[in-house]
Amino acid sequence: MGDGGAERDRGPARRAESGGGGGRCGDRSGAGDLRADGGGHSPTEVAGTSASSPAGSRESGADSDGQPGPGEADHCRRILVRDAKGTIREIVLPKGLDLDRPKRTRTSFTAEQLYRLEMEFQRCQYVVGRERTELARQLNLSETQVKVWFQNRRTKQKKDQSRDLEKRASSSASEAFATSNILRLLEQGRLLSVPRAPSLLALTPSLPGLPASHRGTSLGDPRNSSPRLNPLSSASASPPLPPPLPAVCFSSAPLLDLPAGYELGSSAFEPYSWLERKVGSASSCKKANT
């Protein structure tokens, strides 16, 4: 009985110890869960939990180092970022990068304001002092807006002028190139030009037994190339004759030697009249023999 009561008395103590051990295990598991949750945070969440303002960054730097570093005045923000490997690194942003500053709104000018500003720019490209103050008051603008507009307008004008100069230079270069090509082609044409053909009289060979006066009149002078018939041949009827060959044929085809009894006249039809005279003489001889 005593042993059973002692065991029953020890039971609650053991259960308490086991419960305490369970509590310690639970604390350990909870800490592990917290670490796991902390490891699952994104870099932006870690950056959000870190110093999110210049004052917070300076305070964290003062707490960690005890005094501001030598480059503390040149920076305005420090951000803690966890990379893909789980390493936490600190990123220091420069003072010139102001993330909290709102974006500047773009100034929109009305048509009347633009017309007036353009007229003033055509009159004078630099408006300063009292003129700028008066112009800003009339257009219901600030002096800074007027000054910036004039600066942008001068920059645009310089760009336009440089673009025009480039276009003129390119056009002049193309014109010079075209002119040089034309001159080169003309020079080539002058060098490759065919010489003029010599006169027909120089190409015509001299006929054997033909006087010089007949050569010039029968071949060179076109006025003497018209057909002329002798009185004897005109009396007798003759069939139509083919037209005379041009004088060029004499220069291309070889000339045959004519018999000594065959005399050339000034007309191209005299050979036919000579044949007619020969035929007539032969017929008269036959009649005489009969």
Swiss-Prot record:
GO terms for cellular component: chromatin; cytoplasm; nucleus. The keyword Cell inner membrane does not apply. Keywords: Developmental protein, DNA-binding, Homeobox, Nucleus, Transcription, Transcription regulation, Wnt signaling pathway. Residues 222-238 have a biased composition (Low complexity). Pfam families: Homeodomain. Residues 1-75, 205-240 are annotated as: Disordered. SMART domains: HOX. GO terms for biological process: axonogenesis; brain development; central nervous system development; dorsal/ventral axis specification; ectoderm development; embryonic eye morphogenesis; forebrain development; neuron differentiation. InterPro entries: EMX-VAX-Noto_Homeobox_TFs, HD, HD_metazoa, Homeobox_CS, Homeodomain-like_sf, HTH_motif. GO terms for molecular function: chromatin DNA binding; DNA-binding transcription factor activity; DNA-binding transcription factor activity, RNA polymerase II-specific; DNA-binding transcription repressor activity, RNA polymerase II-specific; RNA polymerase II cis-regulatory region sequence-specific DNA binding; RNA polymerase II intronic transcription regulatory region sequence-specific DNA binding; sequence-specific double-stranded DNA binding. Belongs to the EMX homeobox family. This is Ventral anterior homeobox 2. It comes from Homo sapiens. The lineage of its organism: Eukaryota, Metazoa, Chordata, Craniata, Vertebrata.
